Amino acid sequence: MQRETISVPVGAQEIIFETGKIARQAGGAVVVRCGETVVFTTACAAPNADSTTDFLPLRVDYQEKFSSAGKTLGGFIKREGRPTEKEVLVSRLIDRPIRPMFEEGYYNEVQLLSFVWSYDGINSPEPLAICGASAALVISDIPLIKPVGAVRIGFIDAQFIVNPTIEQQKQSKLDLLIAGTEEAVLMIEGFCDFLTEDQVLEAIEIGHRSIKTICQTLEQWRAKVGKPKNRETLRQLPKELYADVESIANPLLEKALRICEKQKREEALAEVTKAVNDRLMPENEEPKYPAKHIAYVIKDVSSKMMRQMILNENVRSDGRTSTDIRFIDIEQSLLPRAHGSSLFTRGETQALAVCTLGGASMAQRFEDLEGEGNNRFYLQYSFPPYSVGEVGRVGAPGRREIGHGKLAERALMAVIPTKEQFPYTIRLESNITESNGSSSMATVCGGCLALMDAGVAIKRPVAGIAMGLILENERFIILSDILGIEDALGDMDFKVTGDQNGITAFQMDIKVEGITIEIMRVALKQAKEGRVHILNKMLAVCPTYKGEMSRYAPRIETIQIKPSKIAVVIGPGGKQIRAIIEQTGVQIDIDDTGLVNIAAIDLVSIEKAKAIIHGLTAEIEIGRIYSGKAISIAPFGVFVEILPGKEGLCHISEFDVNRINSLDEFVKQGDMLMVKVLDINERGQIKLSRKATLQSQ
């Protein structure tokens, strides 16, 4: 295959797609360039589907090579290994818009691999990775319905920018990543500084215009270099199977789907499955259909019935209408030793949020293509198996937990005070103790309440809500505060956080071929009504953050020293700062500007440490009188420490108003002396006089 390229203008840059030169044995392999950022993506599929599989086994892995930025990984191991948090998040960003675009019935295992090979520090690799994955699938034999494009949108000086540079992103009030087809939007993920619903919609519209151009270009490329699609393995379930399942299941589903309580409803649905299996897979007989096919059709039939129930009657499984919010219960300060805690319960979804405060050393360190850094606010989301009454693995967080935690973290980031306003490192934990939908939004609500309980001076409280969608041809209905079953069987999961004045985060995933701007407009309007209702419930329990922090939380005081004095405080090999910590029991953090944070449980320890640091960094003043300690005595004079680490010489002639021949009769090592600074020579040597202090009395 010869080398083929195609380009498309996007924003202020041009994106170039190339194939035919590298990885020619892969099903599809594409190099995507923008500026000097280069992302390489491959798409490969198994030749056949597993007969027991009733879903698309899609695996997406994104990796940032440190060599792409001319760097080597820190630490002993120099090879990229376990994916970083960012790599997991970008892998999810690629997966979410691509997954719904495979043709129905395609269950072959598919793997998408995306690597950042070159990074210029100007152009973001994330949208390029999504476009590259789409392009690799488009030119392969894997049956993708239509091309997918993606762009990032920023908002600077009241202007929307398509694919802003890295520097522009730092100034932007919006970070929106949007993906879709030529006709509709498939996925959005955005974080902003209280933008309005209209501003968010405008950003989505601007982004989709660029996506259309990308998709049109990729469709032209498919026609030119694409392989014929392999549809031989598409699984078409027989109509007779649907008819058999519906005849058995429909009468039972009518009742089961109207049971309000989750566990009882699931038990009833399990009975429906058993009834179908007993009829279609009788014991000691050859089953009429494979078990996996029957399970798939039962789920499909259940979805159709639930959807018709909502569309025709505006009644949901738990009895609510489309706009109703579940009952909310809030309890504050339930953990006596925690710095801040909140138990947020919404229906059968419950989150226990815990806030912990600490010094700068508690910050979360990271290393990426931009370099090393620290996060002074971070949120960790945990979804244990007991929250849904199951037995499962407990250990390192999975991709879903990382994604949900980052969404909630970014939603709350907009209200976290600056380091100057609140010098603490803030760690939030969200422990999901019950789950029936919207656990990430319960994390936002519970996390906000835990911050206020800990006394964090947040800018303003925020709440979150998850919206659903039932779409049938031209008919649609938006669901507020969705249940787990509505997420599983519905068409959309649209999460929105903020307050009555604006939005801080939003995330949308869909299972159909895209939705229109008009549907999103209705969803955002309904989401605002819902989150304001939830926020009012939160404010009724906790109107504002506590004026005082927990007595178990550390106290932090900040002092400023000259940058030139940092080395003095740290000492050779850190000897001096370790001595201060051991002597006072405090935690000390110093940044490059000379800002010193001193943290301890009690203020007495902080004051001791401050006094030592002030002494170390104080400037010796000529003419000033100091109280110092005699460090050593020589025949010609006594050396006196007037400040920590600062010694001067009081010559024997300057010791007393009367002439003396020996100092041994007048001073011993360790005695405290009042001395005056007479001079400091060019080598920094300090000349002291005790006689001058006696003469001034």
Swiss-Prot record:
Reactions it catalyzes: RNA(n+1) + phosphate = RNA(n) + a ribonucleoside 5'-diphosphate
Name of the top EC class for this enzyme: transferase
Subcellular location: Cytoplasm
Record's GO cellular component terms: cytosol
Cofactor: Mg(2+)
GO biological-process terms attached to the record: mRNA catabolic process; RNA processing
UniProt binding sites for Mg(2+): 487, 493
Record has Coiled coil as a keyword: no
Gene3D superfamilies linked to this entry: GHMP Kinase, N-terminal domain, K Homology domain, type 1, Nucleic acid-binding proteins
Ranges where the S1 motif domain occurs: 623-691
The keyword Nucleotidyltransferase appears for this protein: yes
SUPFAM superfamilies associated with the record: Eukaryotic type KH-domain (KH-domain type I), Nucleic acid-binding proteins, Ribonuclease PH domain 2-like, Ribosomal protein S5 domain 2-like
Catalytic activity, EC: 2.7.7.8
Main subcellular localisation: cytoplasm
Sample GO molecular function, one term: RNA binding
Domain KH stretches: 554-613
InterPro entries the record matches: ExoRNase_PH_dom1, ExoRNase_PH_dom2, ExoRNase_PH_dom2_sf, KH_dom, KH_dom_type_1, KH_dom_type_1_sf, NA-bd_OB-fold, PNPase
Record keywords: Cytoplasm, Magnesium, Metal-binding, Nucleotidyltransferase, RNA-binding, Transferase
Family: Belongs to the polyribonucleotide nucleotidyltransferase family.
Function comment: Involved in mRNA degradation. Catalyzes the phosphorolysis of single-stranded polyribonucleotides processively in the 3'- to 5'-direction.
PANTHER family for this protein: POLYRIBONUCLEOTIDE NUCLEOTIDYLTRANSFERASE, POLYRIBONUCLEOTIDE NUCLEOTIDYLTRANSFERASE 1, MITOCHONDRIAL
Name under which the protein is recorded: Polyribonucleotide nucleotidyltransferase
Species this chain originates from: Protochlamydia amoebophila (strain UWE25)
Biological classification of the source: Bacteria, Pseudomonadati, Chlamydiota, Chlamydiia, Parachlamydiales
